[in-house]
Amino acid sequence: MNAGKYLIVFDINGTLIKRYHKYSEELKRYESMGIVADKVSGAFAFYDRPHLDVLLKFLKTHEVSYILWTTGMEKNAKIFVEHLESLGFDEHIGSYSQIDCKAGKYKIDSSADLWVKDLDIVAKDHGFDVERCILVDDSLDKSLYNQNLICCKEYDPENYDDDGIMEICRYLDAFIGCTKECIMKIMHNTA
């Protein structure tokens, strides 16, 4: 059991990155505006949310474990995770996809049949107390109502001033009860 430790479960699409099918209308619109994808891999174009480097520093400084979880299909999840690993998210202790999700009570606007991320699953798989696990997602509908959640704004590549990662780090800092003079406090004091 990882007593005293914390586990952060990151949603992928909309939270850490934004991915589009490389032939999608959204991608064409972004390209017409001069907003170029950070990477194209297979059938997908990826836009990396600003300040991911700060999040990585936060995770290392606080020595917290993390998982990557998408409601996407398993074959696509592998592509998304590989992209995040190339950005430095290579110390995750696991990755999960749609097949690991549960059905919610009410169908959401999604092609996925399973979309709820139950923290009991990852807590049990990795030996954590579920109260020390938190989901970071851009959708309330993908969480269980009685589990820890940071619901962040969905990343939009058009928003050049996106500070979603900074906001996530501030909430995580509070969740884990950090008392150190860590990167979030240093950045907050210099802002």
Feature locations, PLM:
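C-terminal cap/substrate-recognition subdomain and adjoining C-terminal extension
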Residues: 73-191
